[in-house]
Regions:
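Extended, subdomain-level signal for the structured scaffold at the beginning of enzyme domains
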Residues: 1-98, 161-239, 251-349
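Catalytic nucleophile serine of serine hydrolases
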Residues: 247-249
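Active-site cofactor/cluster-binding pocket
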Residues: 242
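Catalytic-core signal marking the mid-to-C-terminal active-site face
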Residues: 88, 96-167
Length: 349
């Protein structure tokens, strides 16, 4: 059976640029979805932390806006694509994705259909309002009500309050999903009693067919300069076994030693990670971080390959290395790992 070393941070705190402590850990969605996908694919998944301490979910990563139901998330992405053909013209930001009520677009479209509009017409109305809300930094429900000329008395059969109710319901469902994912993670035996990486011998490391590291800022604390992580990477790289990391997870690559020629083990590899543009929009990034992951990877020798815009799904596969840029890349990164491990003959080139 294919064995995956599921390498998760056990850090609970990071130090900001001003020296103050800040809570951290792993991102819940990034940890749960790939784990579930790997188990469903029939892989033997061993949860590992550097010291054997249970991993801790980053409180920021449990924020409701990182846990949109898949139907809402996919519909929002399809809406944004209708007016963001030029990503330099309409910049994708976390604020616009999370604070304007746009994630309720699918639900509002269904509401309009219940009011008698066709699916195509409802979608056109929603996309037009979303574009205005995005460009003008206004609430989606307000813009849509104005565009439809809704009367306060509901004489047109629809009110702004009904639209806002869909926005509120979408948030409530996202909050429930975040709590559900946290509960599910806490029930996984490996997350309660992980294996200590420091306890594994070279022979133990040789039994793994791949490594996967989810993100959250935690990996920058205890996985980025860790000799045991370096041992694991060296063992896998010697066999050109899949090495995969998501979002801040590529911090593990900084633990890799130099090759015989004096260059970094992954020098010249194409890869991605959470970018400085995305970091500037996070809570820790706004407070000020000691260092930035994408800069560190570039300085180490990476050929950095980020997506055309922030917050969109972007996965880079170079030989045996698989990296995903951000939380939105979670499923695609996991699927790339499954594809690599399921190939009849694993490609090392």
């Amino acid at each position: 059976m294919t064995r995956i070393a599921y390498l998760v941070t056990s850090a609970r705190e990071m130090t900001l640029a001003d020296g103050t402590p800040h809570p951290t850990g792993y991102f819940a969605e990034e940890a749960l979805k790939p784990y579930e996908r790997f188990v469903a694919a029939g892989f033997d998944v061993t949860v590992i932390t550097p010291d054997g301490n249970p991993p801790f979910a980053d409180p920021y990563g449990l924020s409701w806006f990182f846990h949109y139901p898949d139907d809402d998330k996919d519909y929002l992405a399809s809406v944004v694509r209708t007016f963001a053909h030029d990503v330099d013209d309409i910049r994708l930001t976390l604020h616009q994705n999370t604070e304007l009520g746009l994630a309720a677009a699918r639900r509002v479209a269904l509401l309009l259909e219940r009011q008698g509009r066709s699916a195509a017409e409802a979608r056109r109305v929603v996309c037009a309002a979303a574009k205005t809300a995005w460009r003008q930094d206004r609430q989606f429900a307000t813009v849509l009500a104005e565009n439809l000329g809704l009367a306060e008395d509901g004489s047109l059969g629809l009110t702004r309050e009904q639209i806002q109710a869909e926005v509120d319901a979408q948030r409530a469902d996202s909050e429930r999903l975040a709590a559900e994912r946290q509960r599910t993670l806490l029930q996984i035996p490996g997350f309660q009693h992980p294996v200590a990486l420091s306890s594994l011998s070279e022979a133990d490391l040789g039994e793994f067919d791949a490594v996967f590291a989810p993100g959250g800022h935690g990996p920058m604390v205890d996985l980025a300069d860790n000799p045991d992580v370096g041992r694991l990477l060296t063992a896998l790289q010697a066999r050109r076994a899949p090495i995969a990391a998501l979002c801040h997870g590529p911090a593990i690559l900084l633990s890799a030693p130099e090759r015989a020629d004096g260059l970094w083990l992954f020098d010249g590899y194409r890869m991605t990670s959470f970018t400085d543009e995305e970091e500037d929009q996070t809570e820790a990034g706004r407070l000020g971080m000691e260092w930035l992951l994408d800069v560190a990877l570039k300085n180490a020798g990476a050929v950095f390959d980020d997506g055309p815009s922030a917050w969109i799904s972007h996965v880079v596969v170079d030989r045996n290395l698989i990296t995903g840029q951000n939380p939105g890349s979670t499923e695609a990164t996991a699927d790339a790992v499954i594809k690599k491990l399921s190939a009849p003959a694993r490609q090392a080139a």
